[in-house]
From Swiss-Prot:
Protein's job: Involved in pre-mRNA splicing.
Organism classification: Eukaryota, Fungi, Dikarya, Ascomycota, Pezizomycotina
Name under which the protein is recorded: Pre-mRNA-splicing factor cwc25
GO cellular component, one term: U2-type spliceosomal complex
UniProt source species: Emericella nidulans (strain FGSC A4 / ATCC 38163 / CBS 112.46 / NRRL 194 / M139)
Keywords associated with the record: Coiled coil, mRNA processing, mRNA splicing, Nucleus, Spliceosome
Basic residues: compositionally biased ranges: 194-208
Pfam families found in the cross-reference section: Cir_N, CWC25
Length: 415
């Protein structure tokens, strides 16, 4: 069900990474063996060539000299400034044509012609020409080294130039980003300054805690008056709806009664009913007008009171802003101290109550445990007395009493 747990081991040969590692090692070993075999074959070939050359020399052939000093022979050692010229040639600062085309230098180069590779095979000496000399000079390992050094130096210079250009481009980009950020912060600062000035104009400069408290109290009173007016208006509207509904019902009943009376016989009190209805309508309209006038007067009086209160609070705040700051601070500190003391007293009282409750609970639990312990001891003592009585009775019984008690059982067995 859980599979082979050996597959979870890093050394298990069935894992793909282990198989890949083994395959890579085998491939590397095979390539190494191939290279070793190639080197062995090359050495065998060189050994065979050397053996053939040795046999040729022993048969009377010319002895071949393994020399490479011709590569480092100086073309012109007579002049004292040859080292500077050769260094300039190797660094690519001077041309080699003027040095190689001189007759005397060509003759000096031809001194080692008899010891060249052609002399070993018994061939006539090879005359060195300009092309061979140029080929030998271009095959100079020191020249190749200097060329590589020069190429590395040029690549390093180009890389430093490219790095400097990238740094300059990065600095220009950072400068543009910095200017854009400064411009954005400046615009946002102007916007915040304008909004701050607008808020500063819309509110007062500085208000004392007393003025803020009066304003808050004034707003609460205004809210209470507004809610009271709304409740009065709703009550009046509800009364009007009830009155109109009752009036409609009364009119409907009256019309039904009048129609019934007309159908039966006209009565002389019809005018009195109409006059009474008109009087009721006039009384209702007069009452409603008086209520609306009282509500308008109360709202105008409240508005005047609110305006007067706001002016008085503003004047009081402007006159007592500097004088009442210290008094308000002292009063606030005193209130905080009193509140802290009151809370401390409440906490102490609560702690005392909790301690008394805890002691009472501990006493009750202790009494209950003591009572249970006494009951257990009593029960245990009664049981011990009963068992001790049984043991004592068994010890005091004689053989005759035991036989007498068991006689009935023996009689039953005999039957």
């Amino acid at each position: 069900m859980g599979g082979d747990l050996n597959l979870k081991k890093s050394w298990h040969p069935s894992l793909l990474r282990n198989q890949e590692r083994v395959w890579a090692e085998e491939k590397r070993a095979l390539e190494e063996r191939k290279r070793i075999d190639q080197l062995k074959r090359e050495r065998d070939e060189e050994r065979q060539i050397q053996e053939l050359q040795r046999l040729q020399e022993s048969a009377g052939g010319t002895r071949q000299l393994q020399r490479v000093d011709w590569m480092y022979q100086e073309p012109s050692s007579a002049s004292g400034h040859y080292a500077e010229e050769m260094e300039g040639y190797l660094l690519g600062k001077r041309r080699i044509d003027g040095i190689l085309l001189k007759n005397d230098e060509s003759k000096k180069l031809e001194k080692g012609a008899a010891t060249g590779p052609g002399a070993a095979a018994g061939l006539p000496p090879v005359v060195h020409n300009t092309r061979d000399t140029m080929a030998k000079v271009m095959a100079d390992p020191l020249l190749e080294i200097r060329k590589r050094e020069q190429a590395a130096y040029e690549a390093m210079v180009k890389e430093s130039v490219r790095r400097r250009e990238r740094e300059q481009g990065r600095e220009r980009h950072q400068e543009r980003e910095r200017e854009r950020g400064h411009r954005h912060r400046r615009d946002s600062g102007n916007d915040s300054h304008r909004s701050h000035r607008h808020r500063r104009r819309s509110r007062s400069r500085s208000r004392s805690p007393r003025v803020e408290k009066d304003d808050r109290r004034h707003r609460d009173r205004e809210h209470d008056r507004r809610s009271h007016r709304d409740r009065d208006g709703e009550r009046e509207n509800r009364v009007e709806r009830v009155y109109h509904s009752s009036r409609r019902d009364h009119d409907r009943d009256e019309r039904y009664d009048r129609a019934a009376r007309r159908s039966a016989s006209p009565r002389p009190d019809r005018r009195r009913d109409d006059r009474r209805d008109r009087d009721q309508d006039q009384d209702y309209r007069r009452d409603r007008n008086s209520r609306s006038s009282r509500r308008d007067a109360r709202s105008s009086r409240d508005r005047d009171t609110d305006a007067f209160g706001r002016d008085r609070n503003r004047d009081r705040g402007s006159h007592s802003r500097n004088g009442n700051a210290d008094a308000n601070a002292d009063q606030h500190a005193q209130e905080l101290e009193e509140q802290r003391k009151r809370r401390l007293a409440e906490m102490q009282a609560n702690a005392q109550d909790m301690e008394a409750t805890r002691r009472q609970r501990v006493a009750e639990v202790t009494a209950l445990e003591e009572k249970q312990r006494e009951e257990d001891d009593k029960r245990r003592s009664d049981r011990g007395q009963f068992m001790s009585g049984l043991h004592r009775q068994l010890q005091e019984d004689s053989l005759d009493e035991r036989i007498r008690r068991s006689r009935g059982a023996l009689t039953k067995d005999e039957d």
